[in-house]
């Protein structure tokens, strides 16, 4: 048994984690933010980093320090809630949305520019068959994920992206563009909300388990040494993400004069790469996107396989991986636009719950791990995050929306769940003072 993880292994696992986080959405959103924020890009990307890097890092640390998985953290409210929440979480960042999205995004950017005269449905089917075939093969043996992803795919991807961003930095396409309306008032806060789109706070409490298992596979099992190694790997991934996000946001912010106000992140990347490198730029970008999507897909399929085979012992890891991969292949062939449209309402509803679970895991010693605090806080948060999900689905809340906009702080900014969550936690704690706490968390977990 090792008492510490060698620096080399720490770096490899850190880059593996970076690769798992740095999926399709992570590459698309910063340039989109940059072009929209213009002169306010630095304030906006600062807010983006809080939710796109800070929250995921907290999720990794929470898993490392508590020694629990996603269900273990959610069980602190109640085991039934823990199971339901974790199943929804894995389905959302797994075969329903995130995994199919990796295939469709890599197709849109890595394949479409080079396809002419081929029917879209046929080309998408062929591409996703190959993409998920590779995913399936590499996910079948998770013990090799660290070496394959950390040693091979990540350096290739990082080098490609580095070439693009360095070219944009040293030979900028123009000055910082004009600020769009969305980023004029509160650019930091707008960037903060945009960071939700990465889904990385959700993924962090899943990927955290992958990191813990990777460290254990290197012979480090003592709890403190294990936690320290996981935190170091998390910091390495966070630093890598920060550099890439800031660079891509700058690329977007300086792109308007050269390529026009494109708006969509994928198109900004494609047009900017072509502007900077010519036809070679599309090849470079396509390779980077495909590798990024592939590494994320492998990590998500692996995590889903481990979780559901544990939840349902009758299903082996291989069977679950097969089901998840095939289902993802089917969903991917509905196309990127449909996947995103279906995912936003569900993510809007569950993302705040994940944030609350992560934050409470750091401070639960203060309120003596009382379940009532977890339950009341999650109820307060969930009621209003569900409203966000309903609005995101396109349904009108009518007079209720008007009332909440006028009376609930932060509601108009999309995080009206914050105050109800805090009030719920306080109410839960006060209740325990009058009626006594229920069983301690360590008795029910």
UniProtKB/Swiss-Prot annotation:
KO phenotype (gene knockout): Mutant is still able to take up isoleucine, leucine and valine.
Q: Could you tell me what induces this protein? A: Expression is under both negative and positive control by the transcriptional regulator CodY. The negative control is direct and the positive control is indirect and mediated by another transcriptional regulator, ScoC (or Hpr), which, in turn, is repressed by CodY. Thus, CodY and ScoC form a feed-forward regulatory loop in which CodY acts an indirect positive regulator of braB. This feed-forward regulatory loop at the braB promoter is an arrangement in which two regulatory proteins repress the same target gene and one of the regulators represses expression of the other.
Keyword field contains Transport: yes
Cellular component GO terms, alphabetical: plasma membrane
MF terms (GO), sorted A to Z: L-isoleucine transmembrane transporter activity; L-leucine transmembrane transporter activity; L-valine transmembrane transporter activity
Task: Output the GO biological process annotations, alphabetical, semicolon-separated.
Answer: isoleucine transport; L-leucine transport; valine transport
Please report the record's description of how this protein sits within the membrane. Answer: Multi-pass membrane protein
Localization recorded for this chain is: Cell membrane
Q: Which UniProt keywords are present, listed alphabetically?
A: Amino-acid transport, Cell membrane, Membrane, Transmembrane, Transmembrane helix, Transport
One Pfam family it belongs to: Branch_AA_trans
Q: Tell me where the transmembrane regions lie.
A: 11-31, 45-65, 79-99, 122-142, 158-178, 192-212, 233-253, 275-295, 311-331, 339-359, 375-395, 415-435
Which protein family is named in the record?
A: Belongs to the branched chain amino acid transporter family.
> What is the stated purpose of this protein?
Branched-chain amino acid transport system which is involved in the uptake of isoleucine, valine and probably leucine. Together with BcaP and BrnQ, plays an important role in the activation of CodY, a branched-chain amino acid-responsive transcriptional regulator that controls the expression of several dozen transcription units in B.subtilis.
The protein's name: Branched-chain amino acid permease BraB
Query: What is the taxonomic lineage of the source species?
Result: Bacteria, Bacillati, Bacillota, Bacilli, Bacillales
């Amino acid at each position: 048994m090792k008492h510490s993880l060698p620096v080399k292994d720490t770096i490899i696992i850190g880059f593996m984690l970076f690769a798992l986080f740095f999926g399709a959405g992570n590459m698309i959103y910063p340039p989109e933010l940059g072009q929209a924020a213009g002169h306010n890009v630095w304030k906006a990307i600062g807010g983006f980093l809080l939710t796109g890097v800070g929250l995921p890092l907290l999720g990794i640390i929470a898993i490392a320090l508590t020694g629990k998985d996603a269900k273990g953290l959610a069980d602190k409210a109640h085991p039934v809630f823990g199971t339901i929440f974790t199943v929804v979480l894995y389905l959302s960042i797994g075969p329903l949305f995130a995994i199919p999205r990796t295939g469709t995004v890599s197709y849109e950017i890595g394949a479409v520019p080079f396809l002419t005269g081929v029917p879209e449905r046929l080309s998408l089917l062929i591409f996703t068959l190959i993409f998920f075939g590779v995913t399936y093969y590499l996910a079948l043996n998770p013990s090799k994920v660290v070496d394959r992803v950390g040693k091979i795919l990540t350096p290739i991807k990082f080098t490609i992206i580095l070439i693009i961003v360095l070219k944009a930095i040293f030979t900028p396409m123009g000055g910082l563009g004009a600020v769009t309306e969305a980023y004029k008032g509160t650019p930091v806060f707008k960037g903060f909300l945009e960071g939700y789109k990465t889904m990385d706070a959700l993924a962090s409490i899943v990927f955290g388990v992958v990191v813990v298992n990777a460290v254990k596979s290197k012979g480090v099992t003592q709890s403190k040494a294990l936690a320290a190694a996981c935190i170091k790997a998390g910091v390495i991934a966070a630093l890598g993400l920060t550099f890439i996000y800031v660079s891509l946001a700058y690329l977007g912010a300086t792109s308007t004069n050269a390529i026009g106000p494109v708006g969509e992140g994928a198109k900004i990347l494609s047009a900017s790469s072509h502007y900077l490198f010519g036809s070679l730029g599309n090849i470079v970008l396509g390779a980077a996107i495909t590798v990024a999507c592939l590494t994320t897909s492998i990590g998500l399929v692996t995590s889903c396989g481990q979780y559901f085979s544990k939840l349902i012992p009758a299903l082996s890891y291989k069977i679950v991986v097969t089901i998840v991969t095939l289902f993802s292949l089917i969903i991917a062939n509905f196309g990127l636009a449909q996947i995103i449209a279906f995912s936003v309402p569900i993510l809007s509803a569950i993302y705040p719950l994940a944030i609350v679970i992560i934050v409470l895991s750091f401070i639960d010693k203060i309120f003596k791990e009382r379940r009532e605090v977890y339950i009341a806080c999650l109820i307060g948060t969930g009621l209003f995050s569900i409203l966000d999900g309903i609005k995101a689905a396109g349904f009108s809340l009518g007079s209720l929306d008007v009332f909440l906009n006028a009376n609930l702080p932060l509601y108009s900014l999309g995080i009206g769940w914050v105050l109800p969550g805090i009030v719920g936690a306080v109410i839960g704690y006060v209740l325990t003072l009058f009626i006594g706490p229920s069983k301690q968390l360590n008795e029910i977990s």
